[in-house]
A protein has these predicted regions:
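Residues immediately within or flanking Cys/His clusters that coordinate Zn2+
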Residues: 6-8, 24-26, 76-80, 98
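Short cysteine-rich clusters marking metal-coordination/redox-active sites
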Residues: 11-14, 29-32, 83-86, 101-104
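Short, non-ligating residues that shape and space the ligands of small metal-coordination modules
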Residues: 18-21, 38-39, 92-93, 110-111
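Short metal-binding segments enriched for Cys and/or His
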Residues: 36-50, 109-118
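Charged, low-complexity helical/coil segments in non-catalytic cytosolic or luminal regions
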Residues: 116-314
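Extended, hydrophilic extramembrane loops/domains of integral membrane proteins
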Residues: 306-334
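Juxtamembrane/start-of-transmembrane alpha-helix segments at the extracytoplasmic/lumenal side
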Residues: 335-346
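Juxtamembrane boundary at the C-terminal end of a transmembrane helix
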Residues: 356-365
């Protein structure tokens, strides 16, 4: 049976289906009236095929410091604590007693012998102590007009713990090319009509971007939104891992390996690349990406522990969790809202808006 194939070309300018005009002997878009030579359009189509989007593949993680195994005697005196409520596991030295779970605040913690985890390559040591974290929470609550008064006066920090969160750090050089559909508008009028002309353009961009230490957290228990909101870290202060840095703190055991983290790394690299390239397209009314091709080279994965302070506080039988970057002091969290203050605030805004509108209408009349 013959292979019947219908080949349809799309207009690079507006995306409409292109037809062959027998009188012009050219391909023509009936939507924007753009004309194309067949060879030109064929070359554009081949270019799009060569820039088909795909997810880059990464080699399996290999420890920067060797095999990823702990050195002889390095884990002596280290223990694991497992929460009987949420199943969270943290690692620390035997002299640092865990009396609560930093993830859910539960106090039922079981200590057991530490075993079975990869040795990290790097660590960023804590720069801010516990008192600094408490002060940051107080500063975070200042100026919040809709915060219940009782939350501040009755607020007690139920648990506060410095914890090293496992992160996979991705390095890569991105060779990228992109095609955009851009438009420019021109307006004019005569005695009868107002006119708008839309001109379509194909814009091409290509270049190289180096990505150094793109972080993806390796813990299911940590909220990804929180962890990314705590960025950026200053990686110039990152040092080779050593167990002395764990003294007085805990380390979350990773439960998302490097392979499972690569899709998020690819997504972050792609989004950053598209954003960087799009920012160079200027002078147009609109700009829409049509195709993107990203080829990653020099790929490398490292395993690091990054410092985070977790604070839990209860208010009206609800637990509120806050997190702070243990290096930079960046603080995030969700606060309760006083419903009475909320409606009072918007009532005042509505009243002021109505008064202004009334005054303007009176002046106009």
């Amino acid at each position: 049976m013959a292979d019947n194939t219908i080949l349809q070309y799309k207009c690079p300018c507006c995306g409409g289906a292109i037809e062959f005009d027998s009188q012009l002997q050219k391909l023509r878009c009936p939507y924007c009236d753009t004309e194309f030579d067949a060879d030109t359009l064929r070359g554009f189509d081949e270019g799009l095929k060569s820039t088909a989007d795909h997810d880059p593949e990464w080699d399996s993680y290999n420890s920067d410091s060797g095999s990823g195994d702990w050195r002889e005697g390095e884990t002596d005196g280290m223990v694991s604590y497992i929460c009987q409520s949420c199943g969270g596991e943290i690692i620390g030295d035997a002299n640092t007693a865990a009396t609560f779970c930093p993830f859910c605040g539960n106090t039922v913690i079981v200590m057991q012998k530490f075993a079975g985890a990869l040795r990290p390559d790097y660590v960023i040591p804590f720069k801010i102590d516990k008192e600094g974290a408490k002060t940051a929470l107080k500063n975070f609550m200042k100026g919040k007009r809709l915060l219940p008064d009782s939350f501040t006066s009755e607020n007690r920090i139920d648990s506060i713990q410095g914890i090293y969160v496992p992160f996979w750090l991705f390095d890569a050089d991105a060779d990228a090319s992109m095609s955009f559909r851009a438009t420019r508008l021109s307006h004019w009028s005569d005695s009868r009509y107002n006119y708008t002309r839309t001109s379509y353009f194909q814009v091409l961009r290509a270049g190289n971007i180096s990505f150094d230490k793109v972080p993806v957290d390796g813990s299911k228990k940590m909220d990804d939104t929180y962890m990314e909101a705590l960025e950026p870290y200053d990686y110039s202060q990152m040092v080779e891992f050593g167990t002395p840095y764990l003294a007085g703190y805990f380390a979350d055991r990773y439960d998302v390996d490097a392979d499972a983290s690569t899709p998020r790394a690819n997504e972050r690299i792609k989004n950053s690349t598209v954003s960087a390239f799009t920012s160079t397209v200027k002078g147009y009314a609109s700009c829409t990406p049509v195709s993107t091709n990203i080829n990653l080279t020099g790929k490398k994965i490292s395993y690091a522990l990054l410092p985070v302070w977790l604070l839990n506080t209860k208010y009206k039988d609800q637990t509120y969790t806050f997190a702070m970057n243990g290096q930079t002091g960046k603080f995030i969290g969700k606060l309760p809202v006083d419903r009475k203050k909320y409606w009072k605030y918007w009532g005042i805004v509505a009243a002021i808006t109505a008064a202004v509108c009334f005054a303007l209408s009176w002046l106009i009349m």
